[in-house]
Design a protein with these regions (language model features):
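Residues forming the Rossmann-fold NAD(P)(H) cofactor-binding site
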Residues: 1
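Generic beta-sheet signal
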Residues: 17, 39, 87-89, 120, ...
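Glycine-rich phosphate-binding loop and adjacent beta-alpha segment
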Residues: 27, 71-145, 179
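A structural signal for short, well-ordered beta-strand elements
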Residues: 103, 151-154
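C-terminal capping/lid region of NAD(P)-dependent oxidoreductase domains
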Residues: 144-151, 159-179
Length: 179
């Protein structure tokens, strides 16, 4: 949700993807995104996501921040406007796969639409950390940032907390309270 909040604070139209009605409500009602695709309701295959994204962004998308990969990435490639930019930060759709997951079937769109896909790791941009923290701190002080967290009790719950990250069991950050 932080990426969504930063984009909204910078004046952009934001379409978010969430797994479940509660998460979708949080993004829409509390974060203020313009549209939410609840992939647990629509289905998370590329065709269903492409249809949902076309409805939410009929003119296409210019920027895409990807934590999921798979059908989500394929749908975003379909919706991309020429010269769109993609920041690829994660591929959670593949983390639990028992066999290799095929990539999007529409990778040729990267060429045809002149898209720019780039891996995104925070440490690559460490030189911008000070400015980012200053801006983020100001938003926090002004009460402009919202968050949720899921807290499990005791070290014995750490494995469940970790697994829950990959199954969507958390709302916001997953924390384990030790004492």
């Amino acid at each position: 949700s932080l990426v969504c909040q930063i984009a909204k604070l910078k004046g952009h139209k934001v379409i978010a993807s969430a797994g479940g009605a509660e998460k979708a409500r949080f993004l829409k009602d509390e974060i203020g995104v313009d549209a939410v695709i609840d992939y647990k309701a629509t289905g998370d295959d590329a065709a269903a996501l492409t249809a949902a994204l076309a409805e939410a962004a009929p003119d296409g998308i210019d920027v895409y921040f990807d934590n999921v990969g798979g059908g989500h990435l394929e749908a975003a490639l379909n919706a991309a406007r020429p010269y769109a930019r993609f920041a690829i930060c994660g591929m959670i759709s593949m983390y639990n796969a028992e066999a290799p997951v095929p990539g999007p079937s529409n990778m040729a769109l990267i060429i045809g639409k002149n898209l720019r896909l780039e891996g995104f790791i925070v440490s690559t941009h460490w030189d911008m950390r000070g400015d980012f923290l200053k801006e983020l701190g100001a938003w926090h002080s002004q009460g402009k940032l919202k968050w949720r967290q899921t807290v499990l009790e005791g070290i014995a719950s750490a494995p469940d907390a970790f697994i829950g990250l990959f199954t969507g069991a958390n709302m916001g950050k997953m924390l384990v309270k030790l004492a």
